[in-house]
């Protein structure tokens, strides 16, 4: 069984790389389902009010994906359950979200992860982090065109996105739940450039070989 999860900020290319990897490896792809998330547009309008509700909704969604991934044995997911708390913690540190709500969420996350079936299967076999600069992040957010994410809708989102990036590097450095690797999303445009795509896929294949999950 090989379970791969993608991580990275908004606009990093997680869903695109998930599709490419799932096709390459012949595995099931699982997506965050942003377009079907009824809370996300509300969150962007009022983060203080909706942070707890959004993260609880996402936690339930991720655990359902984990259960399905275990049943399917091989899968690639475009968002890691381990990084959801990063968004919540950032909002607490910024004074947007309530610290008590974060403690409740963190306890809920821990308890629900304990109930996930199959002790080894709680953790992925590989986490792939896509690193991007703020310029690349903003360009891709603008390109995909979700209205509630756009700076033209809310210019203050630029500061929010910049803060989010500043939280990701320390989070990735501390992450130790599974083997991990970093992809440079600025250097390798794996969506538009075939050569970059091939290099990224080859690097992931080699990592899977190194950790014993690909022959």
UniProtKB/Swiss-Prot annotation:
Asked if Transferase is a keyword of the record, the answer is yes
Where along the sequence do coiled-coil regions lie?
none
- Which positions bind ATP? 8-16
Query: Which EC numbers characterise this protein's activity in its record?
Result: 2.7.1.76
* Gene Ontology molecular function terms on file: ATP binding; deoxyadenosine kinase activity
So where does this one cross the membrane? none
Reactions mediated catalytically: 2'-deoxyadenosine + ATP = dAMP + ADP + H(+)
Which CDD domains does the UniProt record give? dNK (cd01673)
The record's active-site residues are 78 (proton acceptor)
Q: Name one GO cellular component term.
A: cytoplasm
Sorted alphabetically, the keyword list is: ATP-binding, Kinase, Nucleotide-binding, Transferase
* Residue numbers binding substrate: 32, 44, 55, 79, 84, 149
Q: Which InterPro entries match?
A: DCK/DGK (IPR002624), Deoxyribonucleoside_kinase (IPR050566), DNK_dom (IPR031314), P-loop_NTPase (IPR027417)
Looking up SUPFAM superfamilies in the UniProt record yields: P-loop containing nucleoside triphosphate hydrolases
Which family is this sequence assigned to? Belongs to the DCK/DGK family.
Function summary: DGK/DAK plays an essential role in generating the deoxyribonucleotide precursors, dGTP and dATP, for DNA metabolism.
Quaternary structure? Heterodimer of a deoxyadenosine (DAK) and a deoxyguanosine kinase (DGK).
Q: Which PANTHER family match?
A: DEOXYADENOSINE KINASE, DEOXYNUCLEOSIDE KINASE
Q: What is this protein called?
A: Deoxyadenosine kinase
């Amino acid at each position: 069984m090989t379970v791969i999860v993608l991580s990275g900020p908004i606009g990093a290319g997680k869903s695109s790389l998930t599709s490419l990897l799932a096709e390459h490896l012949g595995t099931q792809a699982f997506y965050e389902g942003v377009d079907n998330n009824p809370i996300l547009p509300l969150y962007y309008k009022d983060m203080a009010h909706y942070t707890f509700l959004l993260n609880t909704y996402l936690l339930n969604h991720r655990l359902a994906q984990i259960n399905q991934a275990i049943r399917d044995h091989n899968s690639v997911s475009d968002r890691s359950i381990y990084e959801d708390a990063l968004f919540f913690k950032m909002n607490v540190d910024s004074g947007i979200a309530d610290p008590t709500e974060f403690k409740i969420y963190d306890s809920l996350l821990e308890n629900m992860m304990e109930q996930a079936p199959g002790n080894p299967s709680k953790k992925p076999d590989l986490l792939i982090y896509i690193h991007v600069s703020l310029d690349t992040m903003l360009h891709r957010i603008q390109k995909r065109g979700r209205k509630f994410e756009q700076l033209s809708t809310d210019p203050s989102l630029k500061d929010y996105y910049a803060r989010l990036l500043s939280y990701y590097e320390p989070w990735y450095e501390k992450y130790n739940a599974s083997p991990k690797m970093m992809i440079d999303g600025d250097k390798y445009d794996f969506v538009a450039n075939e050569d970059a795509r091939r290099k990224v896929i080859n690097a992931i294949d080699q990592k899977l070989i190194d950790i014993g999950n690909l022959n």
